[in-house]
């Protein structure tokens, strides 16, 4: 298998794990209006449709610490600590959320074709679309369009605090659906997947302390 195909496969199999970073997104250069997330974590729970793609490649997934694998009655998920994140969570209009972040830990995807260690997970959310990049077996990928983030379909809980003060935010069960670009890249490398842009590949839950800009 070529290095390019390995990278595409590793990214595609781990794609649902590149998710949405606790309601934040793109660009430290916008810190005049972007706050920060601290004490954060992101949990990515993939759907039966995503599991079917893993099964197609006879793939198993394990977490790389400090990320951890969660298996319970609701299915399988991986929880990642948030290393850094900046953005505007747009608490009164979640679909407008934007920002960027990095996750600690990673995943190991094992298939008969090889082992893929996916680390250095980064994600950017802008205009409702999540892009991401990572390192696959140490080789850095470029930023790729991955998912449409259904932030408006998630559930938001935020503890009331005085204006301008840090507040704890939790957003749950945000659906991720593949973008046309991510499906095109997968199709070019491996043939058409059994999913469409309407398929929910994962649900993301995130929590952290949001500190508004200027604090």
Predicted regions and their residues:
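Cleavable N-terminal signal peptides
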Residues: 14, 25-26
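C-terminal segment of classical bacterial N-terminal signal peptides
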Residues: 18-24
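Extracytosolic secretory-pathway proteins
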Residues: 30-110, 115, 121-215
């Amino acid at each position: 298998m070529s290095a390019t195909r390995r990278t595409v496969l590793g990214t595609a199999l781990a794609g649902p794990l590149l998710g949405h970073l606790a309601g934040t997104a793109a660009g430290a250069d916008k810190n005049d209006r972007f706050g920060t997330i601290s004490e954060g974590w992101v949990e990515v729970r993939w759907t039966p449709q995503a599991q079917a793609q893993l099964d197609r490649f006879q793939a198993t997934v394990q977490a790389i610490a400090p990320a951890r694998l969660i298996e319970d009655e609701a299915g399988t998920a991986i929880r990642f600590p948030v290393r850094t994140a900046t953005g505007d969570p747009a608490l009164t209009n979640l679909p407008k959320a934007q920002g960027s972040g990095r996750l600690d830990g990673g995943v190991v995807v094992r298939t008969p074709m090889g082992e893929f260690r996916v680390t250095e997970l980064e994600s950017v959310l802008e205009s409702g679309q999540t892009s991401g990049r990572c390192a696959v077996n140490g080789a850095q990928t470029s930023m790729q369009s991955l998912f449409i983030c259904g932030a408006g379909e998630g559930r938001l809980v935020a503890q009331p605090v005085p204006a301008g003060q840090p507040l704890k935010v939790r957003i749950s069960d945000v659906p991720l659906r593949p973008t046309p670009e991510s499906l095109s890249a997968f199709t070019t490398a491996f043939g058409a997947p059994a999913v469409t842009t309407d398929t929910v590949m994962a649900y993301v839950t995130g929590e952290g302390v949001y500190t508004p800009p200027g604090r």
